[in-house]
A protein has these predicted regions:
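Bacterial N-terminal signal peptides
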Residues: 5-16
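Boundary at the C-terminal end of the N-terminal hydrophobic targeting segment
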Residues: 17-22
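Serine-hydrolase catalytic machinery in alpha/beta-hydrolase-like enzymes
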Residues: 24-120, 216-221
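C-terminal catalytic histidine-bearing segment of alpha/beta-hydrolase fold enzymes
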Residues: 37, 198-244
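Short alpha-helix in the alpha/beta-hydrolase fold that links the catalytic acid
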Residues: 66, 186-196
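Primarily recognizes the serine-hydrolase "nucleophile elbow" in alpha/beta-hydrolase
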Residues: 111-171
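Short beta-strand/loop motif that positions the catalytic acidic residue
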Residues: 170, 176-178
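Acidic catalytic loop of the alpha/beta-hydrolase fold
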Residues: 181-185
Length: 244
């Protein structure tokens, strides 16, 4: 069943206290166990759900807050930990940890996360998507490539694919948020990505904030060594799924 409207509304997640508490959970990824935090809305469900994918800092307080706010908006939000408990204190440390994560393991963890969400009684298995920032935005796209049942992928300034064979694997609808001044993701590549998906008949909604660099949002405040202010050029998207 097609969902309408797919991207009915883009809202700002208010920067305030956590709205919902995360419940520590774990799930199997191959022979390994992945820890995560599950944030649930009030009520019994059946809820749409999102895999919440952290950026290169790790699963820090900022990411937890976004998952909490998503739960406040009606989503079951699973904030996963691709770093196995590590949280970076400096950019150099973040890069080092990120480079040490095997890509195949991360993608396996993500596929296991969607399977875990679909197994929950209070989650609608047909409305499971993903959202990520920076590194996590790229992995959100990877999950759309690897999981044919994924309903939506939100990419906040993450790496993009250009290979036609790869893009053809995407069944999910795609929402992308990018900065026009982001040197790592040129605007031309974003527009090409959008055009390719549209030519394939996919539903894609791209927003480029011309004066914004990367990132577009408030940063982590979990560690004093990480900058505590960043320009707030654009919204963090929330996707409202309504069945036709």
């Amino acid at each position: 069943m097609k969902l309408f409207p797919l991207f009915g509304l883009i809202l700002m997640i208010a920067v305030s206290a956590f709205a919902a508490d995360g419940k520590p959970v774990s799930y199997k990824s191959g022979s390994e166990t992945v820890n995560a935090l599950l944030y649930l809305p009030q009520g019994k469900g059946s809820f749409p759900a999102l895999v919440v994918i952290h950026e290169y800092w790790g699963l820090n307080d900022w990411v937890k807050e976004q998952a909490s706010k998503l739960a406040d908006q009606g989503y079951a939000a699973l904030a996963i930990d691709l770093y196995r408990g590590q949280v970076a204190k400096t950019p150099d440390e973040a890069h080092q940890i990120m480079r040490g994560v095997p890509e195949d393991r991360a993608n396996r963890d993500l596929l296991a996360a969607t399977a875990y969400l679909r197994s929950l009684k209070n989650v609608d298995p047909k409305r499971v998507g993903s959202i990520g920032w920076c590194m996590g935005g790229g992995y959100s796209l990877d999950l759309a490539v690897n999981d044919p049942k994924l309903k939506v992928a939100v990419i906040n300034y993450g790496h993009l694919a250009a290979d036609e064979a790869t893009l053809k694997k995407i069944n999910a609808d795609v929402l992308g948020i990018f900065g026009g001044q982001d040197k790592g993701i040129p605007v031309d590549s974003v527009k090409q990505f959008e055009a390719q998906l549209k030519a394939m008949g996919r539903t894609v909604d791209i927003h480029i904030f011309p004066d914004a660099g990367m990132p577009l949002r408030i940063p982590t405040t979990s560690k004093p060594t990480v900058p505590t202010t960043r320009p707030r050029h654009g919204p963090t998207p929330l996707i409202f799924w309504q069945s036709t």
